[in-house]
Amino acid sequence: MAKNKGVRIVITLECTECRSNPAKRSPGVSRYTTEKNRRNTTERLEIKKFCPHCNKMTPHKEIK
């Protein structure tokens, strides 16, 4: 029998300032992967994390 997938899903967090800021340290967009519990956190996640391209702590929002 196949197991149920469960409520934890893998999500990608992307830097919000890298997309709009042309004057950053290096080209590219910072992305992190993490898991979230779909039952407890139904809305999109937003966490402050370090962005190596901006070289500072920036808000990272959940993308697809």
UniProtKB/Swiss-Prot annotation:
Protein name listed in UniProt: Large ribosomal subunit protein bL33
Family in the record: Belongs to the bacterial ribosomal protein bL33 family.
Parts forming coiled coils: none
Any GO molecular function: structural constituent of ribosome
Record HAMAP family: Ribosomal_bL33
GO cellular component, as recorded: cytoplasm; ribonucleoprotein complex; ribosome
Biological process according to GO: translation
SUPFAM superfamilies (alphabetical): Zn-binding ribosomal proteins (SSF57829)
Entry keyword set: Ribonucleoprotein, Ribosomal protein
Organism domain of life: Bacteria
InterPro entries: Ribosomal_bL33, Ribosomal_bL33_CS, Ribosomal_bL33_sf, Ribosomal_zn-bd
Stored PANTHER family: 50S RIBOSOMAL PROTEIN L33, CHLOROPLASTIC, LARGE RIBOSOMAL SUBUNIT PROTEIN BL33C
Gene: rpmG
One of the Pfam families matching this protein, by short name: Ribosomal_L33
